[in-house]
Amino acid sequence: MTTRRLTRQHLLANTLGNNDENHPSNHIARAKSSLHSSENSLVNGKKATVSSTNVPKKRHALDDVSNFHNKEGVPLASKNTNVRHTTASVSTRRALEEKSIIPATDDEPASKKRRQPSVFNSSVPSLPQHLSTKSHSVSTHGVDAFHKDQATIPKKLKKDVDERVVSKDIPKLHRDSVESPESQDWDDLDAEDWADPLMVSEYVVDIFEYLNELEIETMPSPTYMDRQKELAWKMRGILTDWLIEVHSRFRLLPETLFLAVNIIDRFLSLRVCSLNKLQLVGIAALFIASKYEEVMCPSVQNFVYMADGGYDEEEILQAERYILRVLEFNLAYPNPMNFLRRISKADFYDIQTRTVAKYLVEIGLLDHKLLPYPPSQQCAAAMYLAREMLGRGPWNRNLVHYSGYEEYQLISVVKKMINYLQKPVQHEAFFKKYASKKFMKASLFVRDWIKKNSIPLGDDADEDYTFHKQKRIQHDMKDEEW
């Protein structure tokens, strides 16, 4: 007995026959053998629809955001679907004509032209009775009634609406700056970015005011090493230099390195740490910062490998939990790179000045004498010294405005940086990092400039000018040793 050919209609009929209200009822007189054969064919039909291409495979890195998986599909012409391609219907042609960029011309037949929608559609639902008002009711008598209602609008209201329409393309912040340019001695460089939503020029002033307040709250104690029993400032520099090397090996973002060192300093400002756990604090801090800043964070096994087996995974994870509890999970640190990018706007994003300034800013990670200064002041001093080295001109009013510091407020920080650069190389990884071609050999250039132009500077601790000295918060260190 030959099996009856199973078609798509039979499959749908057998699967939906009992639940489909529009499907005709089956005849009861159908033979049991025919019923069994149709059920067997249905099972076989289900098996035939399963494709081997649905077996899960290893996902490629960009499968979810690219068309890579379309390359493995079978071409449309090679599929034997037994479907007859008919001509497009009128509704399909009309939909294609609506998607076309080129509008229909007058020479085309009337049947191909798109019908214009009516202004007042009867299918629009009306407002409820308790929400509708007589003075603002929508006219339903056509275009004439619409113009009649418009004529009743007061002239003063029309004038206000016209003024808002004319000035809606210019944000209020920049309109005020354009109206009174004589009241400021700096250029509004944010006005040209108002059309870029990524620059958020409407809120940039408020954002950096908030960051200036936040940087004071997240500053570590500049004297926390006095409470440490087994540690010294030299050990902090060695640990930071090793973290710079690990950071370069993993090719992490610069924000990750700054946040990691800030986590270390804030933790040591609150807890006493032993010498054998200092490296563990550094590894856990870099691990936390990687999770906070990076898109692809290195795994904990990578940090175990970089520690050369000194600590296992459980110790690193336990240190991570303990550090986060001590810091109360507060990782909102205003990164120095944010302030450096802001100042670079007034420098017209000069790549050489910015690269040298990045090298000078990272001195604050290694030299503990720069801890009393907030990140914004360190970045302004780094940009000031970089421009001086490259001969980019004086500290003008644009730089004063976008950095927030006058020239006299940066002299003490510049002296600290020059004092560090005049000494022999103490941190090899830091010096080699900026001696590479990637960073334009900035460390070699700075060292040559220091030898030729700088004069020996002593310890000027008594001449420090810390802009936020009166606002610094107090750190209550506990005697609990970890």
From Swiss-Prot:
Query: InterPro entries from the entry?
Result: Cyclin (IPR039361), Cyclin-like_dom (IPR013763), Cyclin-like_sf (IPR036915), Cyclin_A/B-like (IPR046965), Cyclin_C-dom (IPR004367), Cyclin_N (IPR006671), Cyclins_cyclin-box (IPR048258)
Tell where it localizes.
Nucleus; Cytoplasm, Cytoskeleton, Microtubule organizing center, Spindle pole body
The record's section on PROSITE patterns has: CYCLINS
Q: Where is this region: Disordered?
A: 35-140
> Which keywords has UniProt assigned to this entry?
Cell cycle, Cell division, Cyclin, Cytoplasm, Cytoskeleton, Mitosis, Nucleus
Q: Does the keyword Phosphoprotein apply?
A: no
Pfam families registered for this protein in UniProt = Cyclin_C, Cyclin_N
Q: Which SMART domains match?
A: CYCLIN, Cyclin_C
Gene Ontology biological-process entries = cell division; G1/S transition of mitotic cell cycle; meiotic nuclear division; mitotic DNA damage checkpoint signaling; negative regulation of ascospore formation; negative regulation of meiotic cell cycle; positive regulation of G2/M transition of mitotic cell cycle; positive regulation of mitotic sister chromatid biorientation
Q: Name one GO cellular component term.
A: nucleus
The source's domain of life comes to Eukaryota
What is known about what this protein does? Essential for the control of the cell cycle at the G2/M (mitosis) transition. Interacts with the cdc2 protein kinase to form MPF. G2/M cyclins accumulate steadily during G2 and are abruptly destroyed at mitosis. Involved in the reorganization of the cytoskeleton on transition from G2 to mitosis. Association with rum1 promotes its proteolysis during G1. Also essential for initiation of meiosis II.
Query: What family does the entry list?
Result: Belongs to the cyclin family. Cyclin AB subfamily.
Protein name, per record? G2/mitotic-specific cyclin cdc13
Where does this protein come from, organism-wise? Schizosaccharomyces pombe (strain 972 / ATCC 24843) (Fission yeast)
